[in-house]
């Protein structure tokens, strides 16, 4: 990751109370899936988790590693749905790690472990049946090295499932170069926008088995739901913003978060959701590795 500490400050060290009031019930800080008939963020979160586990071909009893677990939506879902599995979740955020541990204790879940560690320094002697990652690789730059590490951590018949947001044909960096780069400066320093095909060019150690695409409209609806929840909770959230950003900057940061959700919604809605989308990929180890 180019600037992991900066990305942490921008997103993941913001108090959990903000995300608890802004995200859905499972605190999924990534794209939800709004299939026909779903009209609530809670339902859309759950459907996205179900689809991810189905595509990752997870079965009860497996050893699972999640890279970049966020607020634990997938980690906790897997721990509940696959009670005989053993799950290790990696996060570089202390506040996220503490939240997941506390939630797991409250739900009497004993089949998961959360490690608070920088992905750049993480290593593991353990081997896993499944490795999963949801919107973490967008914060990383050296994908070939990461794919090699993932391959090493997989058992011979293991699988790697990756969920990323992406542009339909162009990969680009988020860099703070001038006054127009407010999203890079305040929300996504050091990040990248992959292209949908980018993972397919990195198959020295992993081989693609299957891939799927979600229309960008799913992310548009997700971001607009976050915005609505945030606006609805303004009275409760305002003291938190003053405590986090200081009274002099609370209003500016309130508007920045609103603009961030609005800008992302419009981005993924562009061209009827066919320009920026979400990609799902299932990899296996290359034969002989």
Q: Predicted segment positions?
A:
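Conserved SAM-binding loop of SAM-dependent methyltransferases across substrates and taxa
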Residues: 71-83
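Conserved class I S-adenosyl-L-methionine
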Residues: 61-70
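Conserved SAM-binding strand-loop segment of SAM-dependent methyltransferases
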Residues: 107-119
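A short acidic, Gly/Pro-enriched loop at the edge of an enzyme's catalytic core
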Residues: 120-131
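A short glycine-rich, Lys/Arg-flanked "PGG" loop and its adjoining helix->strand segment in the class I
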Residues: 144-159
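Substrate-binding/catalytic lobe of Class I Rossmann-like enzymes that use SAM or dcSAM, i.e.
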Residues: 166-168, 172-278, 284-287
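Conserved alpha-helix/loop element of class I SAM-dependent methyltransferases that forms part
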Residues: 29, 39-62
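N-terminal auxiliary segments of SAM/dcSAM-dependent transferases
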Residues: 1-20
């Amino acid at each position: 990751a180019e600037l992991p500490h900066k990305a942490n400050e921008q997103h993941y060290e913001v108090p959990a109370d903000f995300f608890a009031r802004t995200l859905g019930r499972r605190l999924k800080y990534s794209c939800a899936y709004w299939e026909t008939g779903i009209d609530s963020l809670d339902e859309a979160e759950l459907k996205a988790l179900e689809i991810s586990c189905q595509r990752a071909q997870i079965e009860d009893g497996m050893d699972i590693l999640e890279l970049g677990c966020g607020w634990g939506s997938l980690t906790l879902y897997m721990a509940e749905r696959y009670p005989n599995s053993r799950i290790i979740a990696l996060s570089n955020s202390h506040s996220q790690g503490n939240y997941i541990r506390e939630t797991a204790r409250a739900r009497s879940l004993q089949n998961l472990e959360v490690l608070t560690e920088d992905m750049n320094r993480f290593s593991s002697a353990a081997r896993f049946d499944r490795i999963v990652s949801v919107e973490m690789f967008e914060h990383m730059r050296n994908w070939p090295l990461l794919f090699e590490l993932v391959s090493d951590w997989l058992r011979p018949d293991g699988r790697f499932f990756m969920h990323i947001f992406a542009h339909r044909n162009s990969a680009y960096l988020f860099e703070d170069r001038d006054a127009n780069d407010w999203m890079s400066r305040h929300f996504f320093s050091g990040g990248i926008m992959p292209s949908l095909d980018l993972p397919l060019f990195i198959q020295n150690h992993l081989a693609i088995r299957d891939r799927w695409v979600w229309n960008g409209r799913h992310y548009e609806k997700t971001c607009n739901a976050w915005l609505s929840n945030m606006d609805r909770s303004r009275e409760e959230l305002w003291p938190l913003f003053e405590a986090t950003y200081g009274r002099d900057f609370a209003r500016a940061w309130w508007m920045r978060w609103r603009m961030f959700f609005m800008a992302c919604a419009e981005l993924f809605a562009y061209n009827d959701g066919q320009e920026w989308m979400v990609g799902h990929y299932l990899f296996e180890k290359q034969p002989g590795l």
